[in-house]
């Protein structure tokens, strides 16, 4: 008979119903409504309709004919009074059997099972058969009796097709009910009597949620092993979850790690059986969560995969590491932070959060901070997690430690960091590090930095401080164990201030510099200034290239497409083919890796500019000033020798002698002139000594800074920045593979 689809109210699924079921439903509705004179109503509808054709054809005609079948059923039922008694008997027998099969009944046997043979085909309103009811209520002895004694009434074909209204097979029902004994019985029957094709078809049947039996196998290790090779591991339910995904996210099982490992191995074997490699992307759900996102422990089984994007975001923008940090999965954090493919500071697009923003526990911060140290410029220190407590800003600092643990994470007030930078600046006034810039930026920190734009500035500042203190530790300007706690920093600052105050001032014993020494210093500084200026220009070009490389690549792609279109229109095939061989570098570099390299280049450029400015001041201000005063000093000496050729040296103002009155007057004028020249020569000599001493000290410190800078520059650009850029770029590009 034809089947029709019943339209249900909003919120309910449509249900397909055949004609036999529809008539039974109609009979039930008539009985419940206690409708009288049913035949009269039918006669009226058939003969007194405004349009007689409407009662014979179409939907209304189908409804009238169904009502006629119901009336005939009642007439036939009334004629044969034995049917009522038979129906009542069957009803009582069914009720008795269901009472024995109910979960409230402690008995697990039916002694007179043969008396119920004629009602073993019963199904309830959920579509459950007698077998399904036995399974659901854990009546396994009765189930075995029925299957063994009435094998002809329940052939394997019927067992394979036995489903409830929601599409649950007997095996699904047994797993859902936790009846593992019944499940093993059914599996044994299937394995013994079914072909592989039938097994695959049965095990991968889905219910109304598109779930197969494998989606419910979250604790049943033995069953998983017995049917695992027949499971379609790529089959997704209505939430987009594969069986493997469902097992991975079932956290309440006692043998979670073993279950996960077994399921993964079986799935891997299934892929190989189908001549393919395990594809990680097959197991992403409708929310963008991957297997890495949901795995609670034992992630090394996934990290061994080559085609694995460990930085993949779900639709909320969360990476697997962010999920682990949020839910404090320490073993996963420990494993994933050791993987070189990890991009630690990947940002959640909607909130601009990094994994550090989800960390609420010190042990978690320490774990991810250790990876930050390893990724830092020289692998010595890492600033992260700026927090506000009342009006004070604090930051977590993870650094290399000499203690029992290789790394230590401490919370330090930003004002303490600011004071530390000031102390270092006083000890190293010619440092190439732009410490004054960082001191000013720390002064401007406030709670408004919690906005998205503010977070960008804070992140940039923390990166700069990380680079700065990495260089200071690399050059041994500060002790390695300085950041064990805030008290250590304050103590070191006090000791350092005390030592600085005890040092004698260079102004007390100024050094006399000779022109030859100044010439040597000038030549040395000019050579270094030229080299630094050349390198600074190269850094400037590199910075601009990094900023515009992707934009220029896009422009080039657009221009190439235009040329390609023109080439297609050329009649000459040789000329046309010339437009097809251009290879571009479009999308060769990820924005994330370019941004990281750009940050390091900017830092190196800032350091270069800072050092260049110090050299420039000495080379183009201090030394020319010394030569100017030296020329004046020589001119004064020349004037003195010319005016007083017989004087060995200029007299002091205290020298006196007896003179005649007129001769004394002339001599007095002469002595006054000599004394003026002597004072000028003395002042010029003092100025030369001060300038010379200043240049000498500056030269010594600049020479040391230039040496430190060269060492830092090579390590920063070659060994760290470029290697980190390549590593990050490869990690990001793997996402697109």
UniProtKB/Swiss-Prot annotation:
It comes from the Eukaryota. Residues 1-83 form the VPS9 domain. Transmembrane segments: none annotated. Gene3D superfamilies: Ankyrin repeat-containing domain, VPS9 domain. Belongs to the UPF0507 family. This is UPF0507 protein YML002W. It comes from Saccharomyces cerevisiae (strain ATCC 204508 / S288c) (Baker's yeast).
């Amino acid at each position: 008979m034809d089947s029709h689809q019943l339209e249900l109210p909003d919120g309910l699924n449509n249900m397909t119903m055949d004609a036999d079921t529809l008539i039974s439903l109609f009979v039930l509705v008539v009985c419940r409504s206690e409708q009288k004179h049913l035949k009269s109503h039918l006669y009226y509808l058939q003969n007194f309709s405004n349009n007689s054709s409407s009662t014979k054809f179409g939907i209304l005609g189908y409804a009238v004919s169904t009502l006629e079948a119901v009336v005939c059923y009642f007439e036939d039922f009334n004629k044969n009074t034995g049917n009522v008694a038979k129906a009542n008997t069957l009803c009582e027998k069914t009720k008795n059997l269901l009472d024995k099969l109910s979960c409230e009944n402690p008995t697990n046997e039916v002694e007179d099972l043969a008396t119920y043979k004629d009602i073993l085909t019963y199904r309830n309103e959920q579509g459950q058969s007698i077998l399904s009811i036995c399974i659901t209520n854990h009546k396994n002895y009765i189930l075995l009796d029925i299957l063994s004694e009435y094998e002809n009434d329940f052939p394997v074909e019927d067992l394979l097709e036995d489903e409830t209204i929601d599409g649950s097979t007997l095996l699904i029902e047994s797993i859902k009910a936790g009846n593992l004994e019944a499940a093993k019985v059914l599996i044994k029957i299937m394995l013994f009597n079914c072909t592989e094709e039938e097994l695959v078809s049965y095990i991968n049947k889905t219910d109304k949620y598109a779930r197969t039996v494998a989606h419910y196998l979250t604790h049943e290790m033995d069953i998983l092993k017995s049917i695992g090779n027949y499971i379609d591991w790529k089959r997704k339910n209505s939430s987009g979850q594969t069986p493997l995904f469902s097992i991975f996210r079932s956290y309440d099982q006692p043998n979670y790690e073993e279950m996960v490992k077994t399921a993964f191995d079986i799935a891997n074997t299934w892929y190989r059986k189908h001549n393919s490699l395990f594809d990680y992307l097959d197991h992403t759900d409708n929310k963008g969560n991957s297997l890495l996102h949901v795995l609670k422990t034992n992630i090394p089984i996934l990290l061994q995969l080559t085609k694995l994007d460990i930085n993949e975001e779900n639709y909320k923008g969360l990476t697997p590491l962010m999920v682990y940090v949020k839910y404090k999965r320490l073993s996963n954090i420990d494993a994933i932070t050791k993987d070189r493919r990890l991009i630690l500071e990947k940002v959640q697009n909607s909130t601009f959060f990094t994994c550090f923003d989800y960390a609420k526990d010190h042990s978690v911060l320490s774990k991810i901070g250790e990876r930050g140290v390893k990724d830092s410029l020289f692998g010595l220190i890492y600033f992260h997690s700026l927090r506000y407590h009342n009006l004070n800003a604090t930051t977590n600092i993870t650094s290399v430690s000499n203690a029992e643990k290789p790394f230590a994470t401490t919370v330090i007030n930003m004002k303490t960091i600011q004071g530390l930078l000031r102390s270092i600046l006083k000890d190293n006034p010619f440092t190439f590090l732009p410490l004054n810039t960082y001191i000013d930026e720390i002064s401007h920190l406030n709670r408004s930095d919690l906005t998205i734009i503010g977070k960008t500035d804070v992140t940039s500042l923390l990166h700069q401080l990380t680079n700065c203190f990495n260089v200071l530790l690399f050059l041994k300007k500060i002790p390695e164990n300085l950041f064990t706690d805030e008290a250590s920093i304050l103590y070191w600052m006090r000791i350092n201030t005390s030592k600085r105050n005890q040092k004698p001032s260079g102004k007390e014993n100024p050094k006399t510099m000779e022109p030859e020494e100044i010439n040597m210093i000038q030549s040395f500084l000019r050579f270094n200034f030229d080299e630094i200026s050349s390198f600074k220009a190269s850094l400037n070009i590199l910075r601009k290239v990094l900023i515009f490389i992707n934009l220029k690549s896009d422009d080039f792609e657009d221009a190439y497409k235009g040329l390609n279109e023109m080439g297609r229109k050329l009649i000459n095939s040789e000329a046309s083919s010339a437009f097809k061989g251009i290879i571009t570098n479009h999308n060769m570099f990820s924005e994330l890796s370019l941004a990281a390299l750009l940050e390091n280049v900017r830092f190196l450029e800032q350091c270069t500019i800072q050092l260049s400015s110090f050299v420039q001041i000495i080379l183009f201000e201090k030394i020319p000033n010394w030569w100017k005063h030296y020329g004046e000093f020589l001119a004064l000496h020349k004037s003195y020798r010319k005016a007083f050729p017989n004087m060995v040296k200029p007299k002091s103002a205290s020298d006196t002698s007896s003179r005649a009155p007129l001769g004394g007057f002339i001599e007095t004028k002469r002595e006054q002139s000599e004394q003026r020249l002597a004072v000028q020569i003395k002042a010029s000599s003092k100025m030369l000594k001060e300038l010379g001493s200043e240049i000498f000290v500056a030269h010594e410190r600049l020479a040391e800074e230039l040496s430190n800078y060269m060492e830092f520059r090579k390590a920063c650009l070659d060994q760290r920045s470029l290697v980190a850029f390549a590593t990050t770029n490869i990690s990001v590009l793997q996402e697109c593979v």
